[in-house]
Amino acid sequence: MKLRFHTATVRYLLLVCLAGPALSAAAADTVTRCDELAAHPLDPARVAPGQSSGAIDLPQAIARCRVDVAAQPDNARVRYQLGRVLFYAGQFDEAMVAMRRAAEGGHAQAQFVYGIFVIKERPGAPRDPCVAARNWQAASEGGRHAAAVHYATQYLRGTFDACDDLAAAEAIDRWLQAATRAAPPGYAGYYRLLFVDDLRYRLR
């Protein structure tokens, strides 16, 4: 099987590519106060120690992230973090917009979360599983291993059967192998390995 890129995927990836270069590498790597307050522990692009949801001072993080997004509107990482804390605070409409824009800006963690929003039919999310498929495909290529696991799961369930831009089984298997290599030690890693191994078996 070959990886198929059809019109919708080409448009999405082109949008991601065009959105990325607007922010210089130096600016993108600068640690903001928003990073310090709201970085996700599992974000592969985080530049500060991650904060669990329960450890975040939401009013402070929202206020600071708004300031940092205004100062760096093309910084998809910071915009993702604004979307994250807005969602935790129950400000779903604004959170959805921020997450979508961060995903369109090429931020893998935002692409993963936005796909979750779509599949779980969160308020304001499009009711189109193919949107989740495109975002998880991009996030998987960006190193967000959870996106690969979710993609493979929904792919095997037939959720994406109506989509015309699916990844080939070989590509999904490559993402899952990367997830396996990143498995943590201990029971958490053990159960991840079992689950991912089962997904890979079912893809054959």
Locate the predicted segments by residue.
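N-terminal leader/linker segments that initiate helical-solenoid repeat arrays
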Residues: 26-69
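Single-residue signature of alpha-solenoid repeat helices
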Residues: 61, 95, 132, 168-172
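Terminal, low-structured helical/coil segments at or just beyond the last alpha-helical repeat
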Residues: 30-33, 40, 56, 163-204
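Short coil/turn linking the two alpha-helices of tandem helical-hairpin repeats
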Residues: 39-42, 87-90, 115-126, 152-163, ...
